[in-house]
């Protein structure tokens, strides 16, 4: 009997290097140092290390974390301040960055408060799914508008303070000068005080100094407002076509949405971001909701200004006010409803422009 052996299939050679295990990075951010911790997908803490807040320190942190396995996700605290630069660096390295806001209170009560514990808690928040918010990119037109509005608000506040100081000093000057300036408008008063001669009197010198400071701050406010308007027109010009929306309100809402508005899952998430969504406060047989006092308060204030403008100028809004008033709602409650409607409209315009690819803004 002839026995014919069958050909044996060729098996692939065994891999010399096993696949790297997935790990998760958590970072507790500070001004001068970042503390990082690495955990496995099973929740085992591998190590924690401190790194300087420099470009070299960021690269060292990434290399250190990758030495433990395949790094695909990272939880970073304070992505809008101390952790902003690190979050951008990790995103450019194709790592999914998750914003971690609130610490794990149970873990803090159990292990105390240290930077290493906070870094570990950030990693575990990503692992458990408790932290799932995509941070703002911090690069683009919205980031430009944020710093411009920051400088503008600071200049407006300083100008108001200088005006109040000028009028306070004016009360104690020579009666003849005070009577000559008392009937002038604010603009004329500032212009006149800026041209007062230096007669050696401390009060007169202070009036002239404050008036010139106000004039300089006014120039700054106008220039910053012009740049904000230009940024909005180049980024989302369609927002300015909405009734009641001006450049400053549009900028506040765009800053809240960020340069990556696709991170917002729905208009409800945008409403919650702006603090115009009710919060459930039910228990047992009691079913109720309370006012949302969280969210971005500048965006909330922008929605309020838009609603107030519409109540004065928009026929549809005034008809809505009349109808809701007849139903027994107070004006404050009606304004809250209108703010939610405006947030829905703004969200649609932002997402529509984002899908079409809005142009970037130039400063």
Q: How should these model regions be labeled?
A:
Residues 1-18, 222-223:
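Charged, flexible boundary elements
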Residues 18-40, 122, 155, 252:
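Gly/Thr-rich phosphate-binding beta-strand-loop-beta motif of the actin/hexokinase/Hsp70
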Residues 31-56:
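Short glycine-rich, Thr/Ser-proximal phosphate-binding strand/loop in the N-terminal lobe
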Residues 56-73:
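Short, basic/hydrophobic alpha-helical segments
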Residues 70-82:
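Short glycine-rich phosphate-binding loop at a beta-alpha junction
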Residues 91, 97-137, 143, 147, ...:
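Short alpha-helix plus adjacent loop in nuclease-associated cores
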Residues 147-238:
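Glycine-rich, often acidic, oxyanion-interacting loops/wings at catalytic, nucleic-acid
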Residues 241, 247, 251-331, 360:
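Phosphate-backbone recognition surface of nucleic-acid-processing proteins
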């Amino acid at each position: 009997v002839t026995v014919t052996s069958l050909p044996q299939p060729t098996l692939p050679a065994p891999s010399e290097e096993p696949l790297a295990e997935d790990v998760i990075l958590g970072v507790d951010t500070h001004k001068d140092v970042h503390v990082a911790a690495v955990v496995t997908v099973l929740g085992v803490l591998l190590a924690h290390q401190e790194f300087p807040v420099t470009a070299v320190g960021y690269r060292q942190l990434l290399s250190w974390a990758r030495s433990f396995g395949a790094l695909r996700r990272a939880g970073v605290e304070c992505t809008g301040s101390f952790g902003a630069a690190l979050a951008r660096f990790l995103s450019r390295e194709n790592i999914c960055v998750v914003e971690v806001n609130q610490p794990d209170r149970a873990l803090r009560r159990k292990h105390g408060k240290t930077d290493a514990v906070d870094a570990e808690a950030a990693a575990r928040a990503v692992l458990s799914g408790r932290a799932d918010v995509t941070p703002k990119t911090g690069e683009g037109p919205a980031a430009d508008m944020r710093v411009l509005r920051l400088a503008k608000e600071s200049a407006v506040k300083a100008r108001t303070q200088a005006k109040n100081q000028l009028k306070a000093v004016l009360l104690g000057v020579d009666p003849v000068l005070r009577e000559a300036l008392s009937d002038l408008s604010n603009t004329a008063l500032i212009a006149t005080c800026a041209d007062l001669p230096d007669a050696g009197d401390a009060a007169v010198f202070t009036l002239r100094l404050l008036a010139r400071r106000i004039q300089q701050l006014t120039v700054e406010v106008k220039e910053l407002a012009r740049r904000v308007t230009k940024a909005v027109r180049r980024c989302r010009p369609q927002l300015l076509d909405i009734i009641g929306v001006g450049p400053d309100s549009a900028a506040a809402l765009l800053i809240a949405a960020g340069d990556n508005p696709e991170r917002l899952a729905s208009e409800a998430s945008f409403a919650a971001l702006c603090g115009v969504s009710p919060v459930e406060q039910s228990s047992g047989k009691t079913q109720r909701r309370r006012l949302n006092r969280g969210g971005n308060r500048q965006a909330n204030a922008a929605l309020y200004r838009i609603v107030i403008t519409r109540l004065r100028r928009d026929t549809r809004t005034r008809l809505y006010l009349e109808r809701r008033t007849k139903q027994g709602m107070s004006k404050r409650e009606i304004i809250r409803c209108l703010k939610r409607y405006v947030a829905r409209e703004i969200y649609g315009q932002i997402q529509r422009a984002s899908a079409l690819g809005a142009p970037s803004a130039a400063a």
